[in-house]
Amino acid sequence: MFFKIFVENTVILPNPLILTKIEGLLMIEYLLKNREQIIKKMEKINDINRKEVEEKWILDNFENPKDMGFAGGDGSCNKLDYISFSFYGVGAVSFIHGRGEKVKKAKEEYIFDITHPLDIEDRIRRYMLTLELKTALYVLKNYNIDYYIFDGSLFSLLIFTKKGIEMYERELEEIYNEYGKEFNKKIDEETKSGEIGIISKDLNLELNKKILVEHVEYILTLTKLINEFKDRIIGISKTSKINIYFDKNMPDIAIFTKYTDKSGYSEPIDFVNKLGDEKKEKHKQLSSVVKGINFIKNKPFYAKIDTAYIQFVRLEDNCGVVGLTSFNKIDKEVLSSLKEISINGYPYILKKSHETVEITTKKLEAIAKLLNIDDPIARHILGKKKKKF
């Protein structure tokens, strides 16, 4: 009763601080109503058989490294929304690290431009991924390395091939027939010379067609990387939603992290061949990966993918578990060699790539100032409206 009187007596007060306080109290009231339900859900999620986890975790100190060279890279994208257009920045960077050698930068590329705000999130992400893929191709072609490491899952690259274009597969094939030969030639030239960019970005096309043309360039670049270097690329992720090892309402990476602490790995699973269609369909993420694989394996792209592996690894005791994705099994010598170039169980070149390439909003705003962009920013307009109330 006191709470109701308190609310009724203070709602009429105009002081915004009091109104904010009331909103907070109301949130707490709703939270308390759901407290027991949330606790029960957490208890159910954490109902894990520790013995089952330990049986699937193979202990290993990774003490048999080979003399290997690794390169790794990351990308970044960000945007500022103005009322007339979006100003965006995308970038990709790669570093090389051999055992006992200093880290050196192999490639760094950025694009800053303005564009129509329609589908801007997906478009700049596509630009970023295309730059990352071309950077990987350039480094693999021009440097003496054994493996190229992506910051993140390789499977996300496959999922993105189908993102938002399910209804346009016929149009994509037509665009491939129109631009495929030219794009393939230019991608080869770019990744040989190092003059990397987005070929389709500046084509004078109607916007909807242009988006599809940009997507074809992305798929062609990914297919080229897979067909030429699939045995030498690895994805390393700090997070993962996959739960095929335990089939619980908790990601496998979380289970291995919470219920093991020693260095080791899980047996890699080739889910393309070892999991039945019913189980693949049950796991939405795996189903999306398989759909992406089937899409680019067929006409007109013809990516050569026969296997796709997922496993989890902890390179050092009491460090984080990471997810490894690859198109072939990664042997223990490679894992031992990865440990040699890692800090706290994570490859240093990936950490350095992320820190180098990150395009923060603050950085983008500083670049916009250099360009003297004076168009009003959309959120500033919203802010002015709020002040009138």
Swiss-Prot record:
The Enzyme Commission number assigned here is 3.1.-.-
**Classification via InterPro entries:** NurA_domain
* Broad class of enzyme this protein falls into: hydrolase
GO BP = DNA repair
What's the superkingdom here?
Answer: Archaea
- Mind listing the UniProt keywords for this protein, alphabetically? DNA damage, DNA repair, DNA-binding, Endonuclease, Exonuclease, Hydrolase, Manganese, Metal-binding, Nuclease
Instruction: Name the Pfam families on file.
Output: NurA (PF09376)
Which metal ions or organic cofactors does this protein require, according to UniProt?
Answer: Mn(2+)
Which GO molecular function annotations are given, in alphabetical order?
Answer: metal ion binding; nuclease activity
Q: Which residues take part in binding Mn(2+)?
A: 74, 151
Its annotated function is as follows:
Involved in DNA double-strand break (DSB) repair. Probably acts with HerA to stimulate resection of the 5' strand and produce the long 3' single-strand that is required for RadA loading.
Q: Which family does it belong to?
A: Belongs to the NurA family.
By what name is this protein known? Probable DNA double-strand break repair nuclease NurA
The species is Methanocaldococcus jannaschii (strain ATCC 43067 / DSM 2661 / JAL-1 / JCM 10045 / NBRC 100440) (Methanococcus jannaschii)
